Structures are given as structure tokens and as C-alpha cells.
């Protein structure tokens, strides 16, 4: 009987080549204070080569505010816009609004500062003082205060020590200093903590509403 011989070849399968598609996401790039950005020194861009770092999903959960409602915040002494030392204890005996903001002369921060200015008489009527804190130096604060006729105190937290002591959370994966406001009662106890980075004027609405409810 005749036998049939087949070539000894293993079957070959061709797989289509796959090129990973680039992840479509917005990149972060740092801009100067003078640029027109609502994000106070941070701009979102499709063209920048600087990509945001990849953080684990638990990143936000890992930030625990050190100062919460019902607590006594850490004391501090900082220089004001005139280079004079100002202590938090100076304001004890009356309600005080302490708002942390990213930087002077940035669009969102200027809008917030001017909103506090425009409502300052309402804060005074409620018996409260207003203090703004950022990492800018005293000379920057002085120019900022004079330019926009701000009637309240600005304090310089160079090195962001007080910001860290109070546990003010950052935004945009740590690239942007947080915008957080605290209301302390006459005994120095925190009664309200409000955080809203991209709606700066809401800080004024929420703190006034709270003060007027006391």
C-alpha cells in the first residue's frame, strides 16, 4: 500500500501587530502669574510635554486634614504685608475667617480676594476678622493689598509651614496649593472648614452664611 508523506512543518499563525494607543489626557504645565488662567498658576494644555505623575488611586484618601471642625488649630506667628509679626492668638475673643489661597495676582485668587473685600463690611457686622494666607512674601502681599484696596490682613507663609501644620490639602496631584477656608469662633475652635479650588467666590458665600447663622 502506498503511503502519503507530509512535510514536517508546524503551523504558523500571524498575529496582527498592536501598537499601544497613547493615553488621551490633559497635561500639566506651569505658567507665570501674569498668564490668564483660572487655575492660579497652573494651566491645562494638550501640547505640553510635562505629563501629570501617576499616583495610586488611594492618593486623595491619604490626605487627612489635621485641622477639622471642632478642633483647635496649631498656633502661628507670621509676617503681615508690612513685615510685622502677627499671631493667631491676637484674634481670640472674636470669630476669625482664615483663608489659604495659592498665590497673589493670579486670576482665581484675585477674584477671591476682591470678593472678601466687597463683603468685608458684612464680615465686620458679624463681628469677624478676615485673614488671607499664602506662600508669597510680605512685599508681594503689600503690592497685592494696595493694588486691590484689600481692607484685611495678608500673612506670609513662606515655606508653607503653617499650610502643612494645618493640613491644607493640595489639588491636581499636588501641583496646585489648596484653597481652603476656616471659620474659628471666639474661643479659637474651628467651626467650619470649606474647600473649593475652582469656585473661589463660593468661600465668601459659605463663610458669611455660616457666620450669620450663629
Swiss-Prot record:
Gene Ontology molecular-function annotations: thioredoxin peroxidase activity
Chief location of this protein within or outside the cell: plastid
Disulphide-bridged cysteine pairs: 109-114
Pfam families membership: AhpC-TSA (PF00578)
A GO CC annotation given for this chain: chloroplast thylakoid lumen
Transit pept. (range): 1-64
Alphabetical keyword list: Antioxidant, Chloroplast, Disulfide bond, Oxidoreductase, Peroxidase, Plastid, Redox-active center, Thylakoid, Transit peptide
Protein name: Peroxiredoxin Q, chloroplastic
Lineage: Eukaryota, Viridiplantae, Streptophyta, Embryophyta, Tracheophyta
Amino acid at each position: 500500500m502506498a503511503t502519503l508523506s507530509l512535510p514536517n512543518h508546524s503551523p504558523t499563525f500571524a498575529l496582527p501587530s498592536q501598537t499601544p494607543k497613547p493615553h488621551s489626557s490633559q497635561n500639566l504645565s506651569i505658567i507665570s502669574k501674569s498668564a490668564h488662567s483660572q487655575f492660579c498658576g497652573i494651566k491645562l494644555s494638550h501640547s505640553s510635554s510635562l505629563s501629570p505623575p501617576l499616583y495610586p488611586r488611594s492618593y486623595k484618601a491619604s490626605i487627612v486634614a489635621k485641622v477639622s471642625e471642632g478642633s483647635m488649630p496649631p498656633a502661628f506667628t507670621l509676617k503681615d504685608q508690612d513685615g510685622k509679626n502677627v499671631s493667631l492668638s491676637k484674634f481670640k475673643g472674636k470669630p476669625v475667617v482664615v483663608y489659604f489661597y495659592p498665590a497673589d495676582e493670579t486670576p482665581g485668587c484675585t477674584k477671591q480676594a476682591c470678593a472678601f473685600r466687597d463683603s468685608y463690611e458684612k464680615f465686620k457686622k458679624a463681628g469677624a476678622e478676615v485673614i488671607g494666607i499664602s506662600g508669597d512674601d510680605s512685599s508681594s502681599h503689600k503690592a497685592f493689598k494696595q493694588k486691590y484696596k484689600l481692607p484685611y490682613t495678608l500673612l506670609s507663609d513662606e515655606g508653607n509651614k503653617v499650610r502643612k501644620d494645618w493640613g491644607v490639602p493640595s489639588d491636581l496631584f499636588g501641583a496646585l496649593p489648596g484653597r481652603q477656608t476656616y471659620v474659628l469662633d471666639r474661643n479659637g475652635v474651628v467651626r467650619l472648614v470649606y474647600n473649593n479650588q475652582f469656585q473661589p467666590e463660593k468661600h465668601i458665600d459659605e463663610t458669611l452664611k455660616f457666620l450669620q447663622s450663629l
